[in-house]
């Protein structure tokens, strides 16, 4: 699914797995989309997948819109109780109060905890990178592997996480 926008916030989601009822949503700003979809895994199980790229806070502006979007998604996930994965450039660092509140609101796990920082931005400055790109998951998953991949031409490095869904 693709939703191109000229403002830099267009989104695309490509999957080898079946996407179920994918939708582009505008939770807090008509110019900032997010994606929600079901994904049918090879096992036949279905999970919820959220793709987010909230607007970064600008100098002399607060981050209220970004914060609201993250907390709304977190609360939605917690309310469903279903296996869920959230991924994207959250324009925030892992140790910020906003990111911690997002994880609390959704009862989400950050797979980088205990594994490293996985710094992804800016790709062109290896010594000055920090983590802006995320994969969060609910308690239904365990982490098999997580790593940052080499530069691809983006200003962010790719982040890959291999998660296993607990089938019990």
Predicted segments — roles?
Residues 1-168:
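Soluble catalytic domains of enzymes that build or remodel membrane lipids, polysaccharides, and related
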């Amino acid at each position: 699914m693709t939703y191109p926008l000229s403002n830099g916030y267009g989104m695309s989601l490509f999957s080898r797995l079946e996407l179920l009822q994918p939708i582009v949503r505008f939770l807090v700003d008509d110019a900032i989309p997010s994606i929600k979809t079901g994904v049918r895994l090879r096992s036949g199980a279905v999970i919820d997948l959220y793709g987010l790229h909230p607007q970064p806070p600008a100098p002399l502006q607060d981050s209220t819109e970004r914060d609201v979007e993250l907390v709304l998604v977190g609360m939605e996930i917690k309310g469903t109780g279903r296996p869920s994965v959230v991924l994207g450039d959250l324009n925030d660092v892992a140790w910020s109060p906003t990111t911690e509140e997002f994880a609390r609101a959704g009862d989400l796990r950050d797979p980088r905890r205990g594994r490293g920082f996985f710094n992804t931005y800016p790709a062109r400055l290896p010594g000055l990178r920090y983590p802006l790109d995320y994969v969060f998951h609910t308690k239904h998953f365990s982490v098999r592997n997580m790593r940052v991949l080499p530069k691809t031409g983006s200003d962010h490095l790719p982040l890959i996480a291999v998660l296993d869904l607990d089938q019990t």
